[in-house]
């Protein structure tokens, strides 16, 4: 693994310090812990001390709660800072906001987040970890299904033709994106198992419902 220049600078900066130090990462606000599986010293590009989780994945915490302990020399703590805070902060931020959505969700309604698929590849596992910690689904439904986006509907010619193509795949129910009541009715008649109103308009959702 290539050593970043920041590591070399940290080692030179702290060259005059000896002995071990202890650092503790604490929550700065109330939230939900996520991403601990990615807080791994072996992922750092240089020696980063000894790390120990002080909280559990999915644990609700208050501001000031200790999350991770790092013990090492000054240079190791300097390296650890960049590789502990990032994954923990990103995933926990997602988990905290996702948990707020879940708590505000009416009874009988579930929340799924499929937007993680469009994130840069390195961020996808952290977002999924945040969703899992909050108890949100990363997919529309559990199990196998065929997802047909608006773009796929356009390419296949119509909602009805798209659903027929999806059913022919024979990989579970067909989930299709629609824009209005007319398309939703076509989808239902054509055999769609899941109808997704994808306009970001609550009025459109209410009309289809």
Describe the residue ranges of each PLM region.
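Acidic/glycine-rich phosphate/pyrophosphate-binding loops and surrounding catalytic core
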Residues: 1-190, 194, 200, 206
